[in-house]
Amino acid sequence: MFLPLPDDFHAHLRQGELMPGYVRDLVSQFGRAIIMPNTVPAMSSAAAIAEYKRQILEAAQDVRPDFEPLMTFKLNPNYTEKDLKDMMAVGVVAGKYYPAGVTTNSADGISDFEAVFPVVAMMEKLGLVLCVHGEEPGEFCLDREPAFIKRVETLAQKFPKLKIVFEHLSSAKAVEAVKRLPANVAATFTVHHLMMTLDDVVGDALRPHHFCKPLPKRPEDRAAIREAAFSGSPKFFLGTDSAPHQQGKKECPCGAAGVYSAPVAIPLLVQEFDRAGALDKLPDFIAGFGADFYGLPRTTKQ
């Protein structure tokens, strides 16, 4: 069986001396990827994004010189339409909504939901995609994603022409919400949420390398994710949320959230789709539906 060259619609590459290795791991498996903006400082200007893109392309040269990084900016209420157009000119395709404090490098995230509506309206006008980390701050950890569904529903209602990606779904309630929301709302699934429950994080033993945000949840939540992923619905596609951290930041008293899956994501997906008797659905999941939703041409490479 030959697979199309996959797209990853949610990847973290970090910064500094370790970044080139993370890039090489990613591009060994993927031809395109949505690059997350929660760096320090955040990706929030055309100049910073252009330089980050240059570094990524430089690191990719030895492995996949035609790799295409699809850039994003970190949403805040202060952008002008010119800012957005300038960022689009250097390769930005989406903005990322991080609620304040819910995940890595999100302390400067959104604390006033409606304050970003003017910027979101500009994004809708310009055809930018809104990617959402859907967890409600202050809720019990397993309830944060279900509690955020109302925010996505509000965005979909208020901005009907805006494409919204509810990222890395981890709950049956969120899966059902995406199914019933209009066609301008889609979702990504990670490999680890397809495979794990909370037992795999804190069940018989504490497994820090399985710790991520949003947390894997109950078996019935995983079952809903798997059913949707294997269904062939164009609303669901791959975003690995591959998130590298140094070993000392995972194996410590206060470990960082993130599963580093880039080097093994595609073999694991082949395994899981095969076990489910759904290998015929895998090409669209990894290299079709996401491109369609983002308005990109489907890859012709294998």
Task: Go through each PLM region and give its residues.
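Histidine-centered catalytic micro-motifs
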Residues: 5-16, 130-136, 189, 240-242
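Glycine-rich loop at the start of a catalytic domain that most often binds anionic cofactors/ligands
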Residues: 46-55
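Divalent metal-dependent hydrolysis catalytic cores, especially in the metallo-beta-lactamase
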Residues: 8-9, 22-47, 64-76, 92-105, ...
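Histidine/acidic residue-rich metal-binding segments in metalloenzymes
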Residues: 79-97, 105-238
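Short helix-capping segments at alpha-helix termini
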Residues: 57-67, 157-161, 182-183, 278
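Conserved active-site and cofactor/substrate-binding residues in soluble primary-metabolism enzymes
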Residues: 17, 21, 43-47, 114, ...
